[in-house]
Amino acid sequence: MTSYLSDYVQQIKPSGIRKFFDLAATMEGVISLGVGEPDFVTAWNVREASILSLEQGYTSYTANAGLYSLREEISRYLSNRFDLSYSPDNELIVTVGASQALDIAIRAIVNPGEEVIIPEPCFVAYDALVSLAGGIPVHVHTTADKGFKATAADFEAAVTEKTKAILICSPSNPTGSVYSKEELNEIAEFAKKHDVIVLADEIYAELTYDEEFTSIAALPGMKERTVVISGFSKAFAMTGWRLGFAAAPSLLRDAMLKIHQYAMMCAPAMAQFAALEGLKNGMEDVEKMKKSYRRRRNLFVESLNEIGLSCHHPGGAFYAFPSIKSMGMSSEQFAEELLTQEKVAVVPGSVFGPSGEGYIRCSYATSIEQLQEALVRMKRFLHKTT
């Protein structure tokens, strides 16, 4: 029967994140710090806009690239927030989540055998999407003492004549690291020197806590070689709506649109109307959620260090990535035993690549009370196992 399956699909492993999430779902009393999803409900005015669109009969296809009014609003949003200039006519595309935007971006540019350089630890989908396109993921190892960030020198060491693109996630999933403008400037010079495309996963851009977020596409000479990937799931608490977008020069955007129109036709209309309302009237809610995440981060990361799990300071997203190297066990074993003994679900760092071994990913996108109870259980687990 395996002869029926694509070689590309057979070489891909199931998501390690879902494995622990699914296991936790079978147990009672579990505090999940596993899946990266806001604990907030989508703002009422955003939900109401979607309901109103249905009541008014907007149930048909939209343009392949998305509602023009939404693309106009995305264009204004990118300009006002991140100093990015993209035309709603031919440089923006609304997608079914940021993951689909990344998928079609990779498929639009990567030929079989071409390489995409990816700093790790990295989000589990990156390798799979590159491999499904026939490409080869090439990893750059990063470490906690350097903030889990790759440098231009790291990319120089990994580049070959087959390199087509580099993929940067800032703020990072799973580490929460944020690239500074100075660091991005150096990486931009590398990209221009070697004429490679930059895939910029900026889904967590709004959730940057300590410094102003910089998009690499805003740097001189970078818009024409960058695809910005973003969406509404994280900052707007709209994970279930599955709505994202990509911003790219028209040549790349049009190539992505070819794939999108055959695979998806368009993103769901009711979700697009919801996102439109979010951009127009939902930024105060985004800011409130951001402030809450910042408070949780400060509490959680400080407490992790106090109980003996060394954790670098994450500048964005809603993840902590503490070291468990002192425990004398693998990250997968640690996660399994913490779940079975104390009913706290975390994700082993190893699922994010070899650089993640010896760490665990903890999402602090849950209530302060849940975080405090999780810390009590984790501290008890550490005392029992050391």
UniProtKB/Swiss-Prot annotation:
The UniProt record lists the keyword tRNA-binding: no
Top-level class of the enzyme under EC nomenclature: transferase
Molecular function terms from GO: pyridoxal phosphate binding; transaminase activity
CDD domains: AAT_like
Enzyme Commission (EC) number: 2.6.1.-
A Pfam family annotated for this UniProt entry: Aminotran_1_2
GO biological-process terms attached to the record: amino acid biosynthetic process; amino acid metabolic process
Required cofactor names: pyridoxal 5'-phosphate
InterPro entries xref list: Aminotransferase_I/II_large, AspAT/PAT-like, NHTrfase_class1_PyrdxlP-BS, PyrdxlP-dep_Trfase, PyrdxlP-dep_Trfase_major, PyrdxlP-dep_Trfase_small
N6-(pyridoxal phosphate)lysine: residues bearing it: K234
Cellular component GO terms held in the UniProt record: cytoplasm
Keywords assigned: Amino-acid biosynthesis, Aminotransferase, Cytoplasm, Pyridoxal phosphate, Transferase
Keyword Zinc-finger: no
Compartments, record wording: Cytoplasm
Main location: cytoplasm
Source superkingdom: Bacteria
Classification via PANTHER family: ASPARTATE AMINOTRANSFERASE (PTHR46383), ASPARTATE AMINOTRANSFERASE-RELATED (PTHR46383:SF3)
Family indicated by similarity: Belongs to the class-I pyridoxal-phosphate-dependent aminotransferase family.
UniProt-recorded name of the protein: Putative aminotransferase YugH
Lineage, highest ranks first: Bacteria, Bacillati, Bacillota, Bacilli, Bacillales
Primary gene name: yugH
